[in-house]
């Protein structure tokens, strides 16, 4: 085929000339519009395009599997037939040859063809040569035969001539001799022909037999390759699967063995013959009954892929060993486990490496990462300025909520129980210079986790310090949270309207903890305010906005929202309610939210004042309804696209949380197993705790768990958000627990159960009272403490002998009162030499119960006669002392 131009080739393939020239260039060929294209260049371009479009990546091998199930009817016990299923699995592999293989195959075929032609040519030449030799030999034989016939004729003519001259008797004898000679030659020739025919027939039969045998062997080999993975393991099924000839042979062998056994009982030669035949029969047993497995002699080291949690059974499957081997190994390592025990990743890694395997640690949150990666915003990300998130922190009763209340111009502090904040309040305030979002955190010591969460989600921390009170423990803790979160700190010195205000004291105390005023050369801004009169509040807001400008706070406004859960609760009428601080994007009603272990579609949104809204931008706190459950405070809230995938991720997180929790608990149990054995009996105070919001529940739980001692342990057997239910009451009755409700009440069914079971139910609205009463209950459970108190002291002045009581000490009571029923100690030179009890106490001759200070008496000490003058007798009693925590 003649070369064609680039333009003509572009017209043929239906592409533009520029695109074709570009593809030639990518393939390494430089061409112009009018250049010619050879066949080799076309092939080069075609190979390049195939490689680019995945031609080389196509699979070269395909394996097909087919499974057939058949039923065999075999004879069972008692002559009954039994159906056995036989499963046959067939595997066939097709291999696709690539271009190089095709070329090599073509070359091999050409070479084989040339060899076959050469061989055929050589065979033809040999055949022609053989035919020529046969023809020459035949001609020579014909010539010799003709000469012989000519000689015979000449001889016959001569003989005839002679015969004519002979007598008639001689002629008859000659004819008879010739006849006999011809008969003998004919018989010899017939015998040779018969022998040749027999030899040819024998060779033909042998060739046919060999051909059949070779074909049968080839067929058996192919069948063996096709069914190499199929084994019949049951002996009855194996016999049923054998062909009839093998079964007949086995039956004949069995009958022969039975006969030999009968003969062997007679002993002698029959026994020896029987044993020999038995051995021969055993040697001819079918090989299909032999076991085909040999135990591996070398250890196999595998790459074991371990997730975050794994059970003992799953780990055994990964390492291809029995679960008992892992249990033995862990017993050697000092741990008692069961086959369904959940192991954490670290423990499983130690076990696998101890058994000689290589461990590959994997993370199982691929679906989670995929769902979160799919929410990336489309197009160009546009950052816009956002409002600062300010957290108000400080010690309890230093005026945090009052200051924020003045800023919001609403009475919030009066509505808080006890006048203190017990959960995070999120508000946003519009000022003349812009919007500010405030997070009001509790100041009580119990709310450490809530304050830490507030510092994590914030941009600026405002530390409120009372001018008359100074730096307190929670003030120091707030400073530590701000430093840990690397958050700018602004100090608001409150209660400046009080006459006891001391600014210099506050500055010096804060300086001891690394908070230096700008006046003293530090970096922290100080604002002196009064939440009561409002003095200095404008300066504080101006300082907050100035600090926000320095930080250059920006966020994506358009796109899918993400934020953090500030607070969560279970509302009886609305269900799970979560307060979310939006950090980026816009949260809209109807979005699908993945929130920690929970998920759901937003059914309603409300701002901090309870008004319904449809969307919320960055730095806006909002309440959402529609989650599947109450999320934990501090969880990240993310909007995703697919609700089904969100549910899968939430379920995966729940399962992982449960497995990790169980593994951690089990690890703790194993580590503390021997320590627990040595501990004595520990009393437990069981509590069923319900609170109004998640943050308060966390704070109360941490505070109560911190009250536990070596003798009394606080055990919170159930906790949750929402009202006290009948289930809670039943659980409390069964576990002998007290029910505690913090800003929640029991429903009607729960109250009936509480009355019928006489459960101790207590309501609280201030955390101080709750902790104090639980502490009092724990104090009542403490084991009593006993103390010995001296009630009297007598000095021995003389010793008398009594036939009944032995030595009687004549004493003078110098201190307190001597009582007959009390135990005593005998002191000599202020050293205790005997401890016992009084046997008799007399004044003059009368028995008395007690003798007071300054009186004389006679004292008989039981089982002690070594009383001397100058000894002291000390009388004491054991009193119970109430213990406190």
From Swiss-Prot:
Name of this chain's protein: Translation initiation factor IF-2
Secreted as UniProt keyword: no
InterPro entries: DNA-bd_dom_put_sf (IPR009061), EF-G-like_DII (IPR053905), EFTu-like_2 (IPR004161), IF2_assoc_dom_bac (IPR013575), IF2_II (IPR044145), IF2_N (IPR006847), P-loop_NTPase (IPR027417), Small_GTP-bd (IPR005225)
Lineage: Bacteria, Pseudomonadati, Pseudomonadota, Gammaproteobacteria, Alteromonadales
Main location group: cytoplasm
tr-type G domain location: 385-554
Keyword match Cytoplasm: yes
Biased composition (Basic and acidic residues): 184-232, 267-276
Similarity comment text for this entry: Belongs to the TRAFAC class translation factor GTPase superfamily. Classic translation factor GTPase family. IF-2 subfamily.
Source organism: Shewanella sp. (strain MR-4)
Region (G4): 494-497
Binding site for GTP: 394-401, 440-444, 494-497
Pfam families in the record: EF-G_D2, GTP_EFTU, GTP_EFTU_D2, IF-2, IF2_assoc, IF2_N
Region (G5): 530-532
Ranges annotated as biased composition (Basic residues): 253-266
Annotated stretches, region: G3: 440-443
